[in-house]
Amino acid sequence: MSKPPRRSPRKPTPASPELQLGHEVVWPTSPDAARLDRVANPQRDTDYLARFTAPEFTSLCPVTGQPDFAHLVIDYAPGAWLLESKSLKLYLASFRSHGAFHEDCTVGIGKRIAAEIKPKWLRIGGYWYPRGGIPIDVFWQTGKLPKGLWVPDQGVRPYRGRG
């Protein structure tokens, strides 16, 4: 039995100079300093949903400076552009030293992404862990859901404590 021919390893696509992907980058010091990159959507004529989940998002309380933690779920129906995931990771990490209330963080992230990629539709769910015994869940979306778009539940259970 003969062996199949050896295939040469796939050559990586050269990194685009416009993107952070494929390049060493400096961690942004604030959300305003962070850059969100977009790439062309090869399936722009098809309605579909893309989901990013950040289960360990952190920011700071603007009053006490104490850390706040959230599970973020970002759903969007892409238009001409896709959100590049490395830039999203860096953008979300920039909140680690940023003081803002839960509502401001969640809605601000949704608005910033929507402004950058101009999706057909976007929603963000911010499921914040309790501070002072009260969990805060924040939801925002750009508008009406495109007809026929399948959007699964965000899959984050309501906070139940230890019970």
UniProtKB/Swiss-Prot annotation:
Q: Name one GO biological process term.
A: tRNA modification
**Binding positions for substrate?**
83-85, 102-103
Reactions accelerated catalytically = 7-aminomethyl-7-carbaguanine + 2 NADP(+) = 7-cyano-7-deazaguanine + 2 NADPH + 3 H(+)
User: What are the record keywords, sorted?
Assistant: Cytoplasm, NADP, Oxidoreductase, Queuosine biosynthesis
Q: Which GO terms describe its molecular function?
A: preQ1 synthase activity
The protein's matches in SUPFAM superfamilies, at most eight in alphabetical order, are given as: Tetrahydrobiopterin biosynthesis enzymes-like
Where in the cell is the protein located? Cytoplasm
Q: What is this protein called?
A: NADPH-dependent 7-cyano-7-deazaguanine reductase
